[in-house]
Amino acid sequence: MLNYFIKRLLGLIPTLLIVMVLVFLFVHLLPGDPARLAAGREADAAVIEMVRQDLGLDKPLPHQFWHFLTNILQGDLGTSMVSKRPVTQEIALRFMPTFWLTVCSMAWAVIFGMAIGIVSAVWRNGWPDRIGMTLAVSGLSFPAFALGMLLMQIFSVELGWLPTVGADTWLHYILPSLTLGAAVAAVMARFTRASFVDVLQEDYMRTARAKGVRESLVVLKHGLRNALIPVVTMMGLQFGFLLGGSIVVEKVFNWPGLGRLLVDSVEMRDYPVIQAEVLLFSLEFILINLLVDMLYAAINPAIRYK
C-alpha cells in the first residue's frame, strides 16, 4: 500500500505541470489590462507602461511562464498586484473561513443526505422514499444564490434570528453552510439510495435476515459498510467541490474566504492570486481523490493495492 501511495504522489507531478500551463494560459487570455487596473483610472500611458514593466507583463509569455514556474518551485507564489502583499499571506488569511465553512456544510449534508438515502432505500417506493427523493430533487434544482437570498430574507431580515453577513461567530456559519450544503445533501441522498438498493438485494443480506438478525442490524452492520465504498467516492468529490466551489455562496453572504478573494482577483485581473488559487483548488481535488482511494482499504479490508 505504501508503494501504491508513493506512485500516486509521483503521478501528481505531470498532472500539476499540465494544470500550471492551462491556468497560466487561461489567466493571460482574460480580457482587460491588469497594468491599467493597477495604475488607476487617472494614470496616463507612461505610468501604465511603468506599472507593466514593474509587474513583468512586458516580457514574452514563455519568459513569464518560466518565471512563474521557478517561483512556485521555490515556494514563492508571487505578490498580489492589488494589495502588494505576498499571495501566500492573502490565501492564508482567507483559507480557514472557507475550510470551516466547507466542514460545516459537509458535516450536515453527509449526515442528512445519507439518512434520507438509507430510509428511502429501506422503504423503497413507499411514502418515505417519495418524500426523501422530492427533497433531493428540490435541493438539486434550487440555485445556490437564490436559496441563500431566500434564507437570508427569512431568517435575517424578516425574523432577525441570524446575522446576515460576516464570519465572526458560529451563528454566521448557519445560513452559508445550509446554502452550500443543500446540493451536496441532495446528491448524497440519491447516491446513497442507489447504492443501498443494490446492497439490499445481495445474498448475504437475505442470509442475515434468514438467521433472525434484526432488520436494523442487517441494514447498519451488513449493508452500510458495503454500500459505503461508492458513497465515499462521491463524498470526496463533493468535499473538493465545496472547498473550491463556494464562490457564489461567499459572494452572497460577503464571506471572507477564498471564493470571494478569487472573484475580486478576477475583477481586478490580479494574475498571481488567480493562478495560485486555481492551482490550490486543483491540488485539493487531486489529494482528496488520493485520500479516498486510501479510505477504501479501511472500509473494506478485502481491497488491497498493488
Curated annotation (Swiss-Prot):
Residues 30-98, 152-168, 250-278 are periplasmic. Residues 95-292 form the ABC transmembrane type-1 domain. The keyword Transmembrane applies. The chain crosses the membrane at residues 9-29, 99-119, 131-151, 169-189, 229-249, 279-299. It comes from the Bacteria. Keywords: Cell inner membrane, Cell membrane, Membrane, Transmembrane, Transmembrane helix, Transport. It is a multi-pass membrane protein. PANTHER family: DIPEPTIDE TRANSPORT SYSTEM PERMEASE PROTEIN DPPB-RELATED, GLUTATHIONE TRANSPORT SYSTEM PERMEASE PROTEIN GSIC. Belongs to the binding-protein-dependent transport system permease family. The complex is composed of two ATP-binding proteins (GsiA), two transmembrane proteins (GsiC and GsiD) and a solute-binding protein (GsiB). Part of the ABC transporter complex GsiABCD involved in glutathione import. Probably responsible for the translocation of the substrate across the membrane. This is Glutathione transport system permease protein GsiC. It comes from Pectobacterium atrosepticum (strain SCRI 1043 / ATCC BAA-672) (Erwinia carotovora subsp. atroseptica). The gene is gsiC.
